[in-house]
């Protein structure tokens, strides 16, 4: 099974110079948690997640309209797979890169779609439940292992929660 059977199409994108305010609005309007950042040729150069926006706002102490993806995407590893890659290759790449979403590219490197762990879980669950042939079912073991790894918290970053008292 190839990843192009699972990937989301018609992905909303932004440019490196877009404001994080605009990126957050795209996420809200299209009910998604990540927006790929593309260059003028529609080739992925990074990705902005809802967590990136929250952390940028908190750490930079600036309004979102004054922040752009280019301020942090170049320090992140670009995680992509090709649309003809197998589900297993995509899972392996997500696991090795420690990501929950991976951009999918065409043979020419342009953005074709995106796949999230939620997409994979939904697809594998549906294919296993609806399959009449064992050859069409998906082995959930690698999916579950990948979910465990990318969902694990980084203990060195965890801090006890403290109550915030209003002024």
Q: Which sequence ranges carry the predicted segments?
A:
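The conserved cystathionine-beta-synthase
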Residues: 13-31, 38, 80-98, 104-107
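Short hydrophobic beta-strand segments in globular cytosolic domains
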Residues: 44-45, 54, 105, 111-112, ...
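Structural motif
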Residues: 34-35, 45, 78, 101-103, ...
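Generic alpha-helical hydrophobic packing signal
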Residues: 13-14, 34, 69, 101, ...
């Amino acid at each position: 099974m190839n990843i192009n059977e699972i990937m989301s199409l018609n992905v909303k994108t932004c440019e490196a110079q877009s404001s994080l305010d605009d990126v957050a609005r795209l996420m809200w309007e299209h009910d998604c948690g990540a927006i790929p950042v593309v260059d003028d040729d529609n080739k992925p150069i990074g990705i902005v997640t809802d967590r990136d926006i929250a952390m940028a706002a908190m750490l930079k102490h600036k309004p979102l309209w004054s922040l752009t993806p280019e301020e942090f995407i170049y320090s992140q590893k670009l995680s992509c797979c090709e649309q003809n890659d197998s589900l297993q290759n995509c899972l392996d790449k997500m696991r090795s890169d420690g990501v929950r979403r991976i951009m999918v590219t065409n043979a020419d490197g342009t953005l074709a779609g995106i796949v999230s762990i939620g997409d994979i879980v939904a697809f594998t669950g549906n294919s296993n439940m609806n399959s009449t042939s064992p050859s069409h079912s998906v082995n959930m073991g690698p999916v579950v292992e990948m979910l465990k790894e990318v969902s694990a918290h980084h203990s060195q970053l965890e801090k006890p929660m403290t109550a915030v008292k209003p002024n």
